[in-house]
Amino acid sequence: MTHDIQAAGDPVRLAQSAVQALYRTDRASQGLGLEIIDVAPGRVRVEMTVRPDMLNGHGMCHGGIIFALADSAFAFACNSHGEPMVAAGANIEFLAPSLSGERVTATASEVSRTARNGIYDVCVTKSSGETVAHFRGRCSRLRVSTPSGAIQ
């Protein structure tokens, strides 16, 4: 992942650059119509509008879509430090339905971060402030091969 060289000394600019770089190639988040609203190191807020094609058989937003929204916020937050991280586990609790046309927000916050792992909480809310879901994700640093073949 390459980032703005100017951002190296500024954690907020580094976070914004890292998240923008990840979003540019994230077809799933783009397909959801996800918008990045706010970025800081270890914290990201994203929003989307529930579309008719996102509804389940009960006429409410499918749980998998809510999970994908939360997972995207989690991914952006754990990658906001400029280190490549991937999900190692996640769980979600659904608390209220979201309907077609509603705007939903996922706010991801860093709970714990080490050189190799991180824990992030994501709260998904409606524009009314009602909580739709709570998500917790665990990430691990992506091991990348260098040109010499060494694993970092």
Predicted features along the sequence, with ranges:
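Terminal targeting signals and extreme-terminal segments of soluble enzymes
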Residues: 1-152
